[in-house]
Amino acid sequence: NIQGQGECAIFRKFGHRGLFSVGGPIEANGRLCYIDNCTTTVLSPAARLGDPCLNLLVFPENVKQTLHIHPSLRYGIVVAGRGVCVNPSTGELPLRPGMTFCLEETYPHCFNSDKEGLVIVAYHPDSDMGPTDQQNPMLNRTYTRF
């Protein structure tokens, strides 16, 4: 029984059994470079190649992001700041803290942040990174010939 005054968004890939993990707090800047001077951090990595992952996206103030697509859908929640998600066909979707959204696969879009910048946590249902049975930290750093 969950009680309280807060709100929750659950993004789930049916059939996937994820690992329990606790992350945070969200940092002011991402640890990796992203397009148009934005940054990103992998908050919850894929346990295996192809598994879902959770990422932080940080947009500095007044960013006009390059129009782009993703090969799979994206779920997002606006953590802080304000801006818009732009699609050439449907126009602008205003973004504000606490708002959740879904971008369908191959949906052309870009984010534009305002003077506050914009912070988004994005769920990716798949990943092109992650360990495999042939490539993983345990196996890669085990030497049977020494």
Residue spans for each PLM region:
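Short, conserved beta-strand element in jelly-roll/cupin
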Residues: 56-60, 68-85, 124
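Glycine-centered loop/turn positions within well-structured domains
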Residues: 41, 73, 83, 101, ...
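Short loop/beta submotifs within extracellular cysteine-rich repeat domains
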Residues: 65, 84-86, 129-131
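Short, low-complexity cationic-aromatic patches
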Residues: 1-6, 45-51, 63-75, 107-116
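Double-stranded beta-helix
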Residues: 7-38, 112-146
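A short glycine-rich, His/Asp/Glu-containing loop-to-beta-strand
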Residues: 29-66
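Short acidic-glycine-tyrosine-enriched beta hairpin
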Residues: 1-4, 87-107
